Amino acid sequence: MNQPLQHTTVLLDEAVHALLGDGDAPAGTFVDGTFGRGGHSRLILQRLGPQGRLVAFDKDTEAIQAAARITDARFSIRHQGFSHLGELPAASVSGVLLDLGVSSPQIDDPQRGFSFRFDGPLDMRMDTTRGQSVAEWLADAETAQIAEVIRDYGEERFAGPIAKAIVARRTERGPIASTAELADIVAGAVKTREPGQNPATRTFQALRIFINAELEELQQALEGSLHVLRPGGRLVVISFHSLEDRIVKQFIAQHSKEVYDRRAPFAPPQPMRLRALERIKPSTDEVAANARARSAVMRVAERTEVPA
């Protein structure tokens, strides 16, 4: 029987150091865009000065409940996705941390429906109080829509056969309601398997990303960070798959260079608004201790003096 895993925060010390810098007890306002179970937030609060502030965001009601146990007056949390961080005052934040993806408590709770390893309701919503579940969406989606989601968000080469198999099963037996049923359908449609990977891995990833609009929220959060970060403020993002990392990498690259307007070739360029600092992968020891760290990539950038 699979046992739920205790959540271990990936790149904990590296991320907090990148966010706060080398100074002792920094002041300023910092943002933890993904509170989760509070691994990063608690360490930030330990190292933050008495005048510092930490604002956390999370869509998950269980994360909000966990955050309620923090009684530190310097801490506050908002029951919102990190796409709302841009609503903070302009140039008011000294650092933004985004730890993307799903936490172990979410993955390992069968009732959340994130994992093919446990049989449970096919939900996958980060915020269970709003929006469609995966089961509800699959009940009405067309074959082409399902294939597009699985292909674009899961980078799954068997997206077409999987989508056809889902619709065929739905037509024959009614709506697909459980993770086990979906995993069984996918396994039957995927003819070759990648070594060490369950055939349902990419499909489950794709549906989770789609149903939670994860990539759109990430793009909004990155844009929002330009608005709220003060000059010298840090942007720290930990991603866990290539789609996320590509967005972060391209965003930092786009804003780390001068931009010329082709329609006005003699106009001065728009100066860069970010300075790329580093890219960090977990150590061999961390990956050995926490298998979920193996795909993590952390990118760090610094806000320049240029106004948003």
Swiss-Prot record:
MF terms (GO), sorted A to Z: rRNA (cytosine-N4-)-methyltransferase activity
Catalytic reactions of this protein: cytidine(1402) in 16S rRNA + S-adenosyl-L-methionine = N(4)-methylcytidine(1402) in 16S rRNA + S-adenosyl-L-homocysteine + H(+)
InterPro entries: RsmH, SAM-dep_MeTrfase_MraW_recog, SAM-dependent_MTases_sf
Enzyme class, spelled out: transferase
Gene3D superfamilies: Putative methyltransferase TM0872, insert domain (1.10.150.170), Vaccinia Virus protein VP39 (3.40.50.150)
Keywords: Cytoplasm, Methyltransferase, rRNA processing, S-adenosyl-L-methionine, Transferase
Binding-site positions, S-adenosyl-L-methionine: G38, G39, H40, D58, F82, D99, Q106
The organism's place on the tree of life at top rank: Bacteria
Keyword match S-adenosyl-L-methionine: yes
A Pfam family the protein falls into: Methyltransf_5
Gene Ontology biological process terms, A to Z: rRNA base methylation
GO cellular component entries: cytoplasm
EC number: 2.1.1.199
Cell compartments where the protein resides: Cytoplasm
Family: Belongs to the methyltransferase superfamily. RsmH family.
Role summary: Specifically methylates the N4 position of cytidine in position 1402 (C1402) of 16S rRNA.
NCBIfam families for this protein: 16S rRNA (cytosine(1402)-N(4))-methyltransferase RsmH
Record protein name field: Ribosomal RNA small subunit methyltransferase H
Gene: rsmH
